[in-house]
A protein has these predicted regions:
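Alpha-helical transmembrane segments of multi-pass membrane transporters/translocases
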Residues: 34-36, 108, 200-241
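Hydrophobic alpha-helical transmembrane segments of multi-pass membrane transport/permease proteins
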Residues: 13-41, 47-66, 102-107, 165-174, ...
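Hydrophobic alpha-helical transmembrane segments of multi-pass membrane transport proteins
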Residues: 30, 47-119
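Alpha-helical transmembrane segments and their short interhelical loops
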Residues: 90, 98-165, 170, 215-223, ...
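Residue-level recognition of membrane-helix boundary sites in multi-pass small-molecule transporters
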Residues: 19-20, 92, 97, 160, ...
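Short helix-capping/hinge motifs at transmembrane helix termini and TM-loop junctions
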Residues: 35-43, 68, 116-125, 155-156, ...
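Transmembrane helix segments
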Residues: 33-41, 155-195
């Protein structure tokens, strides 16, 4: 019951924050319109073939930018310490924050799908396929929520957290082919992109909806990358607990 109380409290806060509404709802839609205008003319069926990337914009915007800033705000203003003094476990509350962002990500991605349907005649996939996609999307968003926790706990203030998160988000966009299509990358950048764990997760998401891989996922490399993020998150939390 306490977890539900914290979760609903955080969920209400998310919808009252204009900057978080922008990054979770407006920013992903802006990127969809911008990139479809830039690449849609030269790449046939751009929206249909890249809908997984477009939906992942919402995940990265919500987890890396919004969540990290929120955690940094609570950390810098010692709100977590106040919770601990009242008998609330810090990790317990951070998990409630993460879950609240998961719900917002779900709402944001639904908005993107509806806009893509009416603006670009995107056809919704079968319900069973959509459920499988969302299960994978939530699973693959966990490492980025952990990265947001790491940034938020280590940053001295919200401005620092925002700057680090924005840089990390745009680098992730670039090296995963979410900003520039992989086919247009070459040389060393393409090699980095092909081996980047987000590129491979995105490829699996894309395969779920379109039956096409952009790169073949290397699950051992993905597991190693996610394992390192989990280990770093554990070390940072113990240090800042």
């Amino acid at each position: 019951m306490k977890f539900l109380k914290y979760f609903t409290f955080e969920l209400r806060l998310r919808y009252r924050n204009p900057s978080q509404i922008f990054f979770v709802f407006i920013f992903p839609l802006f990127l969809m319109f911008a990139f479809s205008s830039s690449f849609g003319k030269s790449i046939p069926h751009y929206i249909e073939n890249n809908i997984a990337s477009i939906l992942l914009y919402s995940v990265l915007s919500a987890s890396l930018t919004s969540l990290s800033v929120q955690i940094a705000d609570y950390q810098s203003r010692k709100i977590y310490q106040l919770f601990v003094q009242r008998g609330i476990k810090k990790l317990f509350y951070i998990i409630a924050q993460i879950v609240s962002f998961m719900i917002i990500i779900f709402c944001s991605t639904l908005v993107i799908l509806v806009v893509a349907h009416y603006a670009y005649d995107y056809e919704f996939p079968k319900l069973s396929l959509l459920i499988l996609f969302y299960l994978k999307l939530y699973l693959y968003s966990i490492p980025f929520c952990l990265l947001a926790m790491i940034i938020g706990l280590l940053a001295k203030n919200t401005a620092t957290a925002s700057a680090i998160a924005m840089l990390l988000m745009f680098l992730s966009f670039f090296f995963s082919g979410m900003m520039i299509p992989l086919a247009q990358l070459s040389g060393g950048i393409r090699k980095i992109a092909d081996n980047f764990f987000l590129t491979q997760l995105l490829s699996d998401l894309n395969h779920t909806l379109t039956s096409n891989y952009t790169v073949v996922p290397n699950w051992s490399r993905i597991s190693l990358s996610v394992g390192l993020i989990c280990l770093l998150a554990l070390l940072v939390y113990r240090r800042k607990a």
